Every structure is written in structure tokens, then in C-alpha cells.
Amino acid sequence: MIKAVLLASSMMTAMTAAPAAVAQVDIITVTSQKRAESIQDVPISIIALGTDKLDELEISAFEDYVKYLPSVTFQSTAPNATTIYFRGVVSGNDGNHSASLPSVGVYLDEQPVTTILGFLPIHIYDIDRVEAIAGPQGTLFGASAQSGVLRIITNKPDPSGFEAGADLEVNTIKDGDVGYQFEGFINHPISENAAIRLVGWYKRDGGYIDNVLGSRTFPTSMITKTNAALVENNFNDVETFGARAALRIDLDEDWTVTPTLMGQKLRSQGVFAFDPQVGDLDVNRFEPDFSNDKFYQAAMTVEGKLGNLDLVYAGAFLKRQIDSNYDYTDYAYYYDVLFGYGAYFYDDMYNLIDPTQFYQGDDSFTKYSNEFRISSPQDKRLRFVAGFFQNYQRHFIHQQYIVRDMNSIFEITGHPDTIWLTEQKRTDRDLALFTEVAFDITDRLTLTAGVRGYKYKNSLVGFFGYNASFSPDVFDMMGMFVRDGTGEAACNGAPPIVPNSPCTNLDRTVKDTGETHKFNLTYDVDDDKMIYVTYSTGFRPGGVNRRGTLPPYVADELVNYEGGFKTAWSDNQFILNGAFFWQKWKDFQFPILGQNGLTEIQNAAQARIFGFEADMTWAPTDRFTLSGAFSVIDGQLTKNFCGFVDENLVSETDCPQAVDNPLTDGDETLPPEAPSGTPLPVVPRFKGTLTARYEFPLGEFGAHLQGSVSGQGSSPSSLLAVDQLILGNQASFVVADFSAGVGKDNWELVAYVNNAFDERADLFDFVACAIGTCGSRAYQGTNVPRTIGVRFSSRFGVEE
């Protein structure tokens, strides 16, 4: 594709000088199979957005480009708290610090950047391409690639010549605030064999949610809480700033070393959802809401040759720190309304107090990974890639829920005013050996087989819960033991292992081994068309349930059967690709909110997902391009989810109508929490996008007009029948974006309007605590309202 350095100069010059003519679609080179090849030669369902496309679509963040990836859906509570899904592989309620690992792997170049609270909120600038690889990629990418892989590939240092660029942008949101960003890069050759590339950015996203005046009266104490001191319009603004530096050294003709260092800080205020009961884009928040998220990553890639074999080493070290504060008034209010919990909150003089809670979090991540792989020449009839992968990630979790002026008898030891404390260390480790072998049976028929053997070990240790006085051991009137207390009462004298914890009531480890497989048969109909069939599997490691009465959850497996095609017509004037898939999700991990709002994970039997996805690009002339993509996905349970396990600790499925509850000696009956046939949540049956771009001369300038439409159908909010009844479906929506620009030589000026018709997209419906408690007040996560902006870009340097 045309590189960023030519975005204004070559493109605008060509548009000015040349009449309309038949064109070709630019074919992107990808590395989704651990080697560079044309996207049209890869027998995988993949969509890639190259440098030009990222610039044309005004993309700077995940929320900007996910619209153009029809197989990808997501849930997001903040710009730095996003969980993504491929092809409908979602059960809901993901992203908790003590819950399942993600089912999608996210990579920055060669290094995985997925953490338990979601992937890094990487700013998109000076990026070569974004690759969305659908379906299990368990042989080449491993544990975090159960349903797909998202790869962000940066532009690399280039010793062949000097390049530089700068971009300035300002925008305004309808009934919201002003935003702006400054970005720039320099590629500077040091010698014929070395170059350095420096990239920097600052971005301010204006707010659009208003914290309006409101109050809550707690029925037990009749104390009224008001948010008058926190009332503010457009209070959810975001600042993002960071830099990236990469050095390339060609040691000789065969060996190259590329170290990279990247750092970013994101500061957000407010919340990114509104309360329809309060008003459109309005909320009532009674405590400050903010998050400070910073990370840095040091990485190194070494590429070389040993004889006719290609060798690659990729290693990375990542540190991430998230400090946050959030209002938890809904929890306190509804527990008082429904259960009278306000009676437990009084000061040292035993006067009832305001029971409002707020949350303070301090999450510290350390992650490092190493991969070594070797591959044979790709022009041979028999070829292979093989390697070793090691990954380690540690998460120190500090989360405390604070009630001001609470009686000290109920405080967590060493933590004033803290009603609930989580001080835990989570460690996830995995090792793998992998190989993939391809054999050309004929000139047109290729068989590929791959296997990955893995070993994981995951642990969770530390403290969670209440003070022993607030949640003690329980005895009946005869002094007979009824049940254990929680929190400090459950420590039983175990000393603290995690710093700042009062004691230890959780210390559990799970480990397992296994393997994933892939078989692919590809037939080249001719030089421009292929068809393929694939069988592949992916997995997600098991883990620890922090509630001690629950068993660990085991690894879940995704089995994928896929048939696809890739075609180019009329000398690459028209590209059409597609894939049919049928997936079986075995023992899938299902997180629910249990007692005290604790996340519990069970393996919920089985689900099936089938669908079709396609993308196309048409360039009838060198001035006009039409591109689009869509997916149709249907996923549902194939067995009941009863909500408890049998005597063998296996999720119970035999509850067609109602069954005795074994946890209460059978004195009540329970229907299935999610009956067989229940649709999987969050993912719409249809998601699609269409973009048209027309480039033309305008006097001595080059100009363009562009419009894009993206949308999706409705989707269930939850897998659980009761929760779905309360939350309902997430509504369908369609969003339109338009832009127009002019440029000459090395500059371009673009005006744009995003969400032109001010559509209020229903992206995520949720409540602040367990739905049975807080379900009468649901929040809606939404997109940014209509945004009008102007961007100026300039590029310097000669590519050739």
C-alpha cells in the first residue's frame, strides 16, 4: 500500500495529474502465520487495516477501528478497561481481576500485551497495520488466542532515508467538550546499516457525560446524600500521552536487531455510561471517579539466518500500573433499601452514619514473554515453522471499599474506614512448544498441520473480605456451628503473605497440560482464487475461584470447523473473501456475581456458534474505492446451565424444568439459570460496515470525499435468564462518518464529522452490583456523540 510518507505528496500529485482510470486494489502484506505473505495467500479469515486506511478513517484508538472489524465485539467500562471477543465466543461479565483470562490475544508487533483487566489502550499512530485474525490460533499463538488474535504492527526504523511527519487535530462534541491531539514521528538513518524511529503523541478527548444534581435518602438512617459538590458537565474527559522509540541495526546481510521502548499514560475522569432514569448522557455520581493508567514496555526482536533457516527471537518486559477511584453508592443504597444494611454502619459513638461506599484500586502488573522460532524456506515443497514460547504475568491487586467514619470495630485490620479489602497476588504462567508443517501435494493443493503442547500454572494468594467482627463464624441458639465466617474470620491464624494484608485466607494453585491442533487443506483454483477448509482448536487456561467453597474452574476448549475462500477479480480490481464457520465451545468458563458481589466462575457445559463473515474491496477507477465487511453469527447453549455443580464438581445440566437445590437439602426447586437454546450474550447476529472514498483534482490541489456506515443488530445483555429479563437486549444501531479533504505536495487538510446523525449506540448495559440487588438502576455504555473536527497532516522525506 502507499506508505504514510506519501499520504499527501504522491497521492495528491497523482490525483491532480491523472484522469480517471481502471485501478487495482492494494494488497497488504501480513505476518499472521509468523511469516510475511500477501493477505490473499493466507488461508485464514483475516482483515487488515493498513497505514493508509488507518489515516483515512481518522483512527487513533481501539473504539475507532473496531467498527471496521465485523467479527470483533467488545465490552468497555472505560477507555482502559476493554474486553474483546471474536466470533461470538463470549459468556459475559469478563474482566474481573480474579476471573478468567481473556479469550483473545492482543499483540504489539511480536509481543503479547494482554493483561487480565484487558489489553493495553495503545494509541494508534505511525502504525503499519492492524490485523484481526478470526478463529482459534492455538498452534502459533497459544493460550490467549482461543477465539482470535488482534495484532498491532508498528512502522519500523528504515536506514534507507529520512522521514518525518506531524499531525494536528481539534474537534468538538455535540453538547460536549473540545478535544485535540498532537502527533509526530521521525525516522533518522544513523548509518547505512542502522536507523532510529521516534514517535510521540498527546491526545485530549473531550467529555460528554454530565454529572447532574441528585440525592439519595437511605431508608434506615434517613440520611440524605447529595452530589452538589461534584456536579459537572462533560466530566468524562481523557488525556493520553506517550512515546515510542525503536532502533534497527543490521549487523550484516543476515542478522538484524530491533530493540523498542514504549511508554504511555492515560488519565480519565468520570464514567463512560449514562443512567437513562436520570437523563440522556446524564448520571448522578456521589464520589469522585477517575483512573490513572500508565505502562511501559521494553522489547527486542532478533532476526537472522542459519544456513537456509530463518531464526527469530522476540522478547518483551511490560509494567503496568492502574490507580483508580469509583463511586459505589448504588451498592450501599440498594442493600439498605432491600436488606436494611444501613443499620450496620455507625460511628464509634454508635450513631448511624452515611453508609455510602467508594472504591479505591491499585493494580500493578508485571509481564514478560520470550519466543524463539525457526522456519524453513517458504519456497520449498515441504516447509515448517517451529518454536518455544514462555509467558509470565503477575498482578498485585489492592482494592478497598471505604465508608467514612465507620466504627473502628468493623474496619479491616490496618486499613481505617475499610469495610472490604482485597490484597491478592495473581500469577499466570505458561510454556509451550509448537510446530506447523505445510506440504504441497500438488502445485495447487497444500496440506498444513500444526500442534502446540502447553503447560500452565496459575495461582491466587492473599486476602479478601470483611473484618471478623462484621462477618464472624455463625452458631445457632444451641451453640452449634452453622457456617464459617468470611474475611479475617476465615484466616484461621494464617499470617499475611501479600504485603498490606491482615492475614491470608486464600492460597490456591491450579496447573495442567494439554495440546491444541490445526489441520488445513488449501486449493488454489487459479493464481487469484483459493478455497480452504480448516479444523483448529483453541483453549483458555483454568484458574482459581477465590471463594473457598467453590472448586477451581478448568480450561475450556473451542473447536472450530471452517471453510473459506479468497478471490481477486479483474486484475485485482475487485476483492471478495469469506468464511463459513461452526464452533463448539466445551466446558466454557462462565463468570457470575455470587454472594457479596464476588465473581464466581463455573464451567458451563457446552455451546455452539456458527456463522459467516466476508469482506470486499472494489476499485473501478483509481479515484473511487468501495470497501465493506460483515458477519452473521448465531451462538447458543446446547445444554442447560443449572447454576451449581454435581457431586463430581461438574456443572449440572439436568434441570429441564426445575430441580431440588442440593445446597439447601432439597427444600426448594430451581429452574435452569440459562436453559439450552439461550443465545450467547453481547454479540449481535449481524454486524457490518461499508466505506466509499472518491479522490479527484480540485484546481492545483488533490481532494477527496469519504463516507462510511457501520452498524449492528440487537444482542442479549446477559446469558442468565433473570438478568436478561431485567436488562433486556442491547439495541441495534447504525453510525455514519463523513470526511472531506484537500492537499498538495507534503500536506493535507481534512474536515470530518463522526457519528454524523448523533446515534446513541447501546454498547454495554450493566448495573453497579449483583443484578438481584442493583437491577432497578441499569446503566448504558455508549459511543461518543456527533463530533466535528479538523486535522492537518504534513510529511517530509523521500521514500525512494
Segment roles from a protein language model:
Residues F62, T83-Y85, Y107, L120, ...:
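N-terminal periplasmic accessory domains that precede
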Residues N96-H97, S103-V104, D109-A134, F182-G184:
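Short acidic/polar hinge/loop motifs at secondary-structure boundaries
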Residues K174-Q269, Y296-Q297, F365-N391, K425-A438, ...:
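Transmembrane beta-barrel wall of Gram-negative outer-membrane proteins
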Residues E183, T301-T329, D524-R540, V554-F641:
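Membrane-embedded beta-barrel scaffold of Gram-negative outer-membrane proteins
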Residues Y208-N234, Q269-F286, D327-Q360, Q400-E423, ...:
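Solvent-exposed loop segments that connect transmembrane elements
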Residues R248-E253, M262, I374-P377, F389-N391, ...:
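Structural signature of Gram-negative outer-membrane beta-barrels, strongest in the C-terminal barrel
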Residues L447, W582-K584, N603-L719, R791-V798:
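Gram-negative outer-membrane beta-barrel transporters
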Residues V709-L720, G741-E800:
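C-terminal beta-signal and adjacent terminal beta-strands/loops
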